[in-house]
């Protein structure tokens, strides 16, 4: 009888250890994927920032630089902030169990949302400026500028396109951080007054 009990304990212990190892492997895989996803925007942000910083042109019509346009200056600052946050958040996400605490989950959720809207706004206003630079606006007698400053417009366009790739990464990160936060809460429940039963809204 004692041998049988010992055997049962050993088998339960073995299965428990296997489950723990499997959970740790899954957790490590998720953490690695999230870390890589947070690192990816760093290079893109730096690329968009550098391209825009070097964007200037001088010809017989005069000189133009990214610093002459508020939207492009905002794009540079937004990409700089995004690169710094991406690097810092990737370092924190790579730490074992560091991102599992509730304050960290809330922090990632809020900052991921904030950075998504920040970079999206920078890309949107810069794209609007580029549209006017390429097409002008006949209603207010604005002529297009890109026919005279083609190189400037091409570099600005490249920077804006890269910025929208950053936005795509941050949309995915926002979805991940939202999922990690809201799966910690129980689904709301309703009370059936006729049966006096409490039923989960999303089922069992």
Swiss-Prot record:
The keyword Protein transport does not apply. Residues 1-21 are annotated as: Disordered. Residues 1-32, 96-113, 177-204 are cytoplasmic. Glycans are attached at residue 68. It comes from the Eukaryota. It is a multi-pass membrane protein. Homodimer and heterodimers. InterPro entries: CASP/CASPL (IPR006459), CASP_dom (IPR006702). Expressed in the peripheral root cap and leaf epidermis. GO terms for cellular component: plasma membrane. The chain crosses the membrane at residues 33-53, 75-95, 114-134, 156-176. This is CASP-like protein 2A1. Coiled coil: none annotated. It comes from Arabidopsis thaliana (Mouse-ear cress). Residues 1-11 have a biased composition (Basic and acidic residues).
């Amino acid at each position: 009888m004692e041998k049988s009990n010992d055997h049962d304990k050993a088998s339960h212990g073995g299965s428990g250890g296997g489950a723990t190892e499997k959970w740790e492997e899954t957790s490590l895989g998720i953490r690695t994927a999230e870390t890589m996803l947070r690192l990816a925007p760093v290079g893109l942000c730096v690329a968009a920032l550098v391209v825009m910083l070097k964007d200037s042109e001088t010809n017989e019509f005069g000189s133009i630089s990214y610093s002459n346009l508020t939207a492009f200056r905002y794009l540079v600052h937004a990409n700089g902030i995004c690169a710094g946050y991406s690097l810092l958040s990737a370092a924190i996400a790579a730490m074992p169990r560091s991102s599992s605490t509730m304050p960290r989950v809330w922090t990632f959720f809020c900052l991921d949302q904030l950075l998504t809207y920040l970079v999206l706004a920078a890309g949107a206003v810069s794209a609007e400026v580029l549209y006017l630079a390429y097409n002008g606006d006949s209603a207010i007698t604005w002529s297009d500028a890109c026919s005279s400053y083609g190189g400037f417009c091409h570099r600005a366009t490249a920077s804006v396109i890269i910025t929208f790739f950053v936005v795509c990464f941050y949309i995915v990160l926002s979805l991940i951080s939202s999922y990690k936060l809201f799966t910690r809460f129980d689904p709301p429940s309703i009370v059936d007054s006729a049966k006096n039963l409490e039923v989960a809204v999303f089922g069992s």
